[in-house]
């Protein structure tokens, strides 16, 4: 599985890209938990709305295989070998 980290995620991971392999399929929630353990609280603070784990940050978009979507069971989305995942923050302003 290949991952891309846009700012500010790449500041936490110290990488723009990462390739990882797992022995079995895993859910998006498990992937986020994996990165939380690997990169610490700074990573999870970017994912979740402040003080509300389980609610994505309003700035976060996770793109899986070129599609950005969120639905009630988004965290249960199964990821597999060959998937491309992008963690991106959407900023607006002038």
Which role does the model predict for each range below?
Residues 1-93:
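Ubiquitin-like/PB1-type beta-grasp interaction modules and other compact soluble beta-rich domains
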């Amino acid at each position: 599985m290949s991952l891309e980290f846009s700012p500010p995620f790449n500041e936490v991971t110290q990488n723009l890209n990462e390739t990882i392999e797992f022995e079995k399929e895993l859910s998006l929630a498990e992937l986020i938990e994996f990165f939380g353990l690997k990169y610490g609280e700074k990573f999870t603070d970017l994912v979740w709305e402040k003080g509300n784990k389980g609610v994505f940050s309003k700035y976060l978009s996770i793109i899986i295989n070129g599609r950005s979507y969120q639905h009630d069971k988004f965290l249960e989305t199964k990821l597999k070998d060959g998937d491309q995942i992008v963690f991106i923050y959407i900023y607006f302003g002038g």
